[in-house]
Amino acid sequence: MSIVTYQRGDTTALSKNFTRDEFECQCGKCTAQMIDTELVDKLQHIRDVLGVPLKITSGYRCIVHNASKTVGGSPNSKHRYGMAADWRTLNRTVNPVALGIIAQAVGFGGIGIYWHPKAAMCHADTRTGKATWLCTTPRKYPSTTYQKFILPTIRRGCTGEANRAATKMLQRLL
């Protein structure tokens, strides 16, 4: 893990497909932000394997933005340290459960699936331990386990070309 601090307005390329501003705090007031290079490397690997663009819906969050009513983030959120991203495929071509499986396969420590009317995305972070959760109702986060929730989903199969490619890759890995 290597945390790098960037200034607001910096357009540095973090990888082949990600720029610094994609991970910027959405409060609009922060002058600097932190980004874990391991986070970017793993997301780039997922993007390369899937062959579809990823949309970062939330990257770094300052303390104020993380605690805001719009976000309602945990006080210990990995977003506050630049170690987490909420993301999905650009055109929502892969469901968030499949994205969670892929995130687990590339070695993310924290994986959350958000799948409710206001969101359909995956949270991934670079924590050293393991944590998984599923959120199907806004602001309610029951814990789950890889065995109970994520693993059975991949075995049922999926539809769509991008989902089929993700399934094949994961079946080789699991």
Model-identified regions with their sequence ranges:
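Generic detector of short, locally flexible boundary/turn motifs and exposed helical patches
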Residues: 19-23, 50-54, 86-91
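Catalytic cores and adjacent binding grooves of peptidoglycan-active enzymes
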Residues: 75-83, 89-174
